[in-house]
Amino acid sequence: MSQTSSNPATLRLPFKEKLAYGLGDLGSNILLDIGTLYLLKFYTDVLGLPGTYGGIIFLIAKFFTAFTDMGTGIMLDSRRKIGPKGKFRPFVLYAAFPVTLLAIANFVGTPFEVTGKTVVATMLFMLYGLVFSMMNCSYGAMVPAITKNPDERASLAAWRQGGATLGLLLCTVGFVPVMNLIEGNAQLSYIFAATLFSLFGLLFMWLCYAGVKERYVEVKPVDSAQKPGLLQSFRAIAGNRPLFILCIANLCTLGAFNVKLAIQVYYTQYVLNDPILLSWMGFFSMGCIFIGVFLMPGAVRRFGKKKVYIGGLLIWVAGDLLNYFFGGGSVSFVAFSCLAFFGSAFVNSLNWALVSDTVEYGEWRTGVRSEGTVYTGFTFFRKVSQALAGFFPGWMLTQIGYIPNVVQSAGTVEGLRQLIFIYPCVLAVITIIAMGCFYNLNEKMYVRIVEEIEARKHTV
């Protein structure tokens, strides 16, 4: 075990450990984003599935993995035999390889009719989601085991979001050019690009495993009365008001973000008639996200997490509204998208810092420390959001009359504009109301909670 500070709330983490933790979300987002960005288009344009079928695949698979996330959390909180690798790190190490194989397999076509292709694609995506849950939930849930310092948690969240943003940038900017290296065979080009990106994702996950340390792993004696089983774990979630509000917020914001990502490839090709623009837009907008991630820790120290979170949402809304009303050209689309993504950087970064703080809140309220279940309760809502966000674009593409590889009608173009701009705005406004009116955990309250928890331990 590494040396810890006498006061866990003041422990400072070394730079290389923060970097290693950020590499973890770089790797996991590469493995995730190639599917988020391109799998629906692969289903519709290469496999020949109707948009609704592609949406149903996402809906079923993501709802399934919402429950596998919860199962992963309960499994983590039920572990009693903790080896030298730690409580969470082994799953980062061992699950990353099958995740890589299945991320590639998702882009493999089958010689069946539409129904057979749909069934195989659904099963592959569900299996991918199962092992991804084991890897990614363990990665996210170990933050409370790394540090109890709220500033360091915010810093880890920034590094995590930086890694996630870089992963999204690489997938947005690089995937299509890599595909284009294989000419004349769309199926093979998808497999080639997916293989290359997935192998890099695997490498970064293993570097994360090697570079982070678990310092605060509490292993209680094996006692059925103390073991955090299903009922106790759900009690910890149900009585955790900040966690519940944060789950609602993520249901909205992640849904908005994922719909935007899924539709932008259609928007640039069929509305702006410039598919190459997606790479440039990704480059500049992700650069703005990096700026937001860099500024986030300082903004949090000055204004607090809640105010920065809501401020980011307001910037996001402004960017999307400007794009809808004034973003008819390529340059204006990129400029206003940069503004929206800059605002989203604060929101997406702070999600991970806020959910880590709710672990102590839940322990303070119920007496049960359930890092795994708190985190996966949070990701349950994120997966539900991803399920709906995966289904909704595919279903809406059918409703607005989208036909692949042809000039779209005026009604279809307007439908794409509303999907990529207005729909995210509405969800962002709902989130502003939820966080502004109902989220009650601030920095002063968190410090008091940690002190009371430590005092309880000394009196037992």
From Swiss-Prot:
<dbReference type="GO" id="GO:0015293">
    <property type="term" value="F:symporter activity"/>
</dbReference>
<keyword id="KW-0769">Symport</keyword>
<feature type="transmembrane region" description="Helical">
    <location>
        <begin position="243"/>
        <end position="263"/>
    </location>
</feature>
<feature type="transmembrane region" description="Helical">
    <location>
        <begin position="162"/>
        <end position="182"/>
    </location>
</feature>
<feature type="topological domain" description="Periplasmic">
    <location>
        <begin position="264"/>
        <end position="275"/>
    </location>
</feature>
<feature type="transmembrane region" description="Helical">
    <location>
        <begin position="123"/>
        <end position="143"/>
    </location>
</feature>
<feature type="topological domain" description="Cytoplasmic">
    <location>
        <begin position="212"/>
        <end position="242"/>
    </location>
</feature>
<feature type="topological domain" description="Periplasmic">
    <location>
        <begin position="113"/>
        <end position="122"/>
    </location>
</feature>
<feature type="transmembrane region" description="Helical">
    <location>
        <begin position="419"/>
        <end position="439"/>
    </location>
</feature>
<feature type="topological domain" description="Periplasmic">
    <location>
        <begin position="40"/>
        <end position="46"/>
    </location>
</feature>
<feature type="topological domain" description="Periplasmic">
    <location>
        <begin position="408"/>
        <end position="418"/>
    </location>
</feature>
<dbReference type="GO" id="GO:0055085">
    <property type="term" value="P:transmembrane transport"/>
</dbReference>
<feature type="transmembrane region" description="Helical">
    <location>
        <begin position="330"/>
        <end position="350"/>
    </location>
</feature>
<protein>
    <recommendedName>
        <fullName>Putative 2,3-dihydroxypropane-1-sulfonate exporter</fullName>
    </recommendedName>
</protein>
<feature type="transmembrane region" description="Helical">
    <location>
        <begin position="387"/>
        <end position="407"/>
    </location>
</feature>
<keyword id="KW-0813">Transport</keyword>
<feature type="topological domain" description="Cytoplasmic">
    <location>
        <begin position="68"/>
        <end position="91"/>
    </location>
</feature>
<keyword id="KW-0812">Transmembrane</keyword>
<comment type="function">
    <text>Could be involved in the export of 2,3-dihydroxypropane-1-sulfonate (DHPS).</text>
</comment>
<feature type="topological domain" description="Cytoplasmic">
    <location>
        <begin position="144"/>
        <end position="161"/>
    </location>
</feature>
<feature type="transmembrane region" description="Helical">
    <location>
        <begin position="92"/>
        <end position="112"/>
    </location>
</feature>
<keyword id="KW-1003">Cell membrane</keyword>
<keyword id="KW-0997">Cell inner membrane</keyword>
<dbReference type="InterPro" id="IPR001927">
    <property type="entry name" value="Na/Gal_symport"/>
</dbReference>
<feature type="topological domain" description="Periplasmic">
    <location>
        <begin position="183"/>
        <end position="190"/>
    </location>
</feature>
<dbReference type="GO" id="GO:0005886">
    <property type="term" value="C:plasma membrane"/>
</dbReference>
<dbReference type="Pfam" id="PF13347">
    <property type="entry name" value="MFS_2"/>
</dbReference>
<feature type="transmembrane region" description="Helical">
    <location>
        <begin position="19"/>
        <end position="39"/>
    </location>
</feature>
<feature type="topological domain" description="Cytoplasmic">
    <location>
        <begin position="440"/>
        <end position="460"/>
    </location>
</feature>
<feature type="transmembrane region" description="Helical">
    <location>
        <begin position="276"/>
        <end position="296"/>
    </location>
</feature>
<comment type="similarity">
    <text>Belongs to the sodium:galactoside symporter (TC 2.A.2) family.</text>
</comment>
<dbReference type="InterPro" id="IPR036259">
    <property type="entry name" value="MFS_trans_sf"/>
</dbReference>
<feature type="topological domain" description="Cytoplasmic">
    <location>
        <begin position="297"/>
        <end position="307"/>
    </location>
</feature>
<feature type="transmembrane region" description="Helical">
    <location>
        <begin position="47"/>
        <end position="67"/>
    </location>
</feature>
<dbReference type="InterPro" id="IPR018043">
    <property type="entry name" value="Na/Gal_symport_CS"/>
</dbReference>
<keyword id="KW-1133">Transmembrane helix</keyword>
<keyword id="KW-0472">Membrane</keyword>
<dbReference type="GO" id="GO:0006814">
    <property type="term" value="P:sodium ion transport"/>
</dbReference>
<feature type="topological domain" description="Periplasmic">
    <location>
        <position position="329"/>
    </location>
</feature>
<dbReference type="InterPro" id="IPR039672">
    <property type="entry name" value="MFS_2"/>
</dbReference>
<dbReference type="GO" id="GO:0008643">
    <property type="term" value="P:carbohydrate transport"/>
</dbReference>
<feature type="transmembrane region" description="Helical">
    <location>
        <begin position="308"/>
        <end position="328"/>
    </location>
</feature>
